[in-house]
Amino acid sequence: MSEAGEATTTTTTTLPQAPTEAAAAAPQDPAPKSPVGSGAPQAAAPAPAAHVAGNPGGDAAPAATGTAAAASLATAAGSEDAEKKVLATKVLGTVKWFNVRNGYGFINRNDTKEDVFVHQTAIKKNNPRKYLRSVGDGETVEFDVVEGEKGAEAANVTGPDGVPVEGSRYAADRRRYRRGYYGRRRGPPRNYAGEEEEEGSGSSEGFDPPATDRQFSGARNQLRRPQYRPQYRQRRFPPYHVGQTFDRRSRVLPHPNRIQAGEIGEMKDGVPEGAQLQGPVHRNPTYRPRYRSRGPPRPRPAPAVGEAEDKENQQATSGPNQPSVRRGYRRPYNYRRRPRPPNAPSQDGKEAKAGEAPTENPAPPTQQSSAE
């Protein structure tokens, strides 16, 4: 029983072994002898290396990849250096011609009289007032000569002693106005808080600054605050409304200050001599009176026969001391055609006088006698 139990424990302990331990324990066992002899161990040796390379968590593959990339970059850099080999530095030359649209031209070297190709990307210091990189025809420049694909090329092009190049006259200039210049609000200058505090402090203390300080402060204010002159004047009302007062009768009276100054004569009947009586004056400056035709006066219609007789009767009944009836008065329509009795009272309620003759004359006596 004891031997069987020991065998069971040994089997249970060997089952849960990790694969790494099994792999580590495998090389310790002696390798089986093969009939070939020494050739078998040489063939079995590369197996661990293949296992490490195939392991996804291993570091051998990324290291090899990074090394290959670095080597390729170094090779490319070396090839570029080999292509852009520097032949001369700080060489002076004269621009033969330069096309701004295409962006390339040629420079004639002063030492060897050789034409060197120049591209706009080779210009190192451009004119700050120019929008595009360029060099002007006949301009003296300083540059480095490098070996290009088709011949000598210019690089690091600047003016003499490293100053910016002048540029071509055909190149576009940059905009001259400052950003936001036209968007500024044009109005009177703003008051500075510091100046207001200084003025307030001087007035509160109760003494005036000396004359020299006033001169300096005035000059400083002129420098700080530019004089603002409006281009047009704003008038709310016409000038004839200024200095005048209006009353209920629409009479235009001068300002009291003008009366005190003696510009207008004495007052007569409550109205000064210089004042003029005018029609109704409107305060609204946009008011326009209605158009009235100024033609000849219209003729009045001739009075009717009955109206003429009434006027004669009124003149006869009214005495010399009685006031005349106002003009334009017309009697009602009902009283026009009524026959008036001889002794009827007049319109004013007074009876006709005894001495006055009746309005209707009697028939002549000759006719009466003949009738009898």
Curated annotation (Swiss-Prot):
The modification N-acetylserine is found at S2. Residues 1-82, 181-372 are annotated as: Disordered. Disulfide bonds: none annotated. The keyword Repressor applies. It is found in: Cytoplasm; Nucleus. Residues 93-157 form the CSD domain. Residues 314-324 have a biased composition (Polar residues). The modification Omega-N-methylarginine is found at R251, R326. Residues 222-238, 327-340 have a biased composition (Basic residues). Residues 7-28, 35-79 have a biased composition (Low complexity). PANTHER family: COLD SHOCK DOMAIN CONTAINING PROTEINS. Binds to the GM-CSF promoter. Seems to act as a repressor. Also binds to full-length mRNA and to short RNA sequences containing the consensus site 5'-UCCAUCA-3'. May have a role in translation repression. This is Y-box-binding protein 3. It comes from Homo sapiens. The lineage of its organism: Eukaryota, Metazoa, Chordata, Craniata, Vertebrata.
